[in-house]
Amino acid sequence: NPETRYAGTPHNVGYEVVERLALSWGLSWDMTPEALIARGSAEGKNVCLVKIQTAMNLTGSGLKHLSESMAFSPEQCILVFDDLDLPISAVKTRIKGGAGGHRGVASVLEAFQTDAIRRVKVGVGKAGGKLDRVTYVLTAFDEESRIAIDQSILTAKAHLLDMMGRPSVAKTH
């Protein structure tokens, strides 16, 4: 979600991973009507990082439109997103499959009519106590969780590099 009120919440972990990649690679963001885009060369490859500027649940239509104007296929994409079903700090990759209940991923799979889209899932844990799922993903991380998420983001970056075909410096799971 592009709005600043989502910064630092479980809902925007994917954005954080992509932002940190852009920063570590020295890429800057350009704004288009659909997305913020950072292009350049990194790790010996041409890369294009995308932050769709729509609500998470509408990511698919924005990414599909962008794929048509920029001529890329879903097989060239790697989605990065939060996963409530993974414990906080866990990171997993998939090369294809269903949405697993994630509305943003469902939107992308529906827009492209394929499940063959690679993904990096960053665990944000489950809502605890009296919080419902929606409130939880829209509430900023507490200090302990923030530390775990920061480590997860580093792990997610390593997994992204692996998926791009570059051996990772640290093989983590």
Predicted feature residues:
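Nucleotide and nucleotide-moiety/phosphate-recognizing core
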Residues: 1-96, 106, 110-120, 127-132, ...
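Conserved TIR/SEFIR loop-to-helix hotspot centered on a Trp-containing motif
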Residues: 99
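Intrinsically disordered, low-complexity regions enriched in acidic/Ser/Thr/Pro/Gln residues
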Residues: 137-140
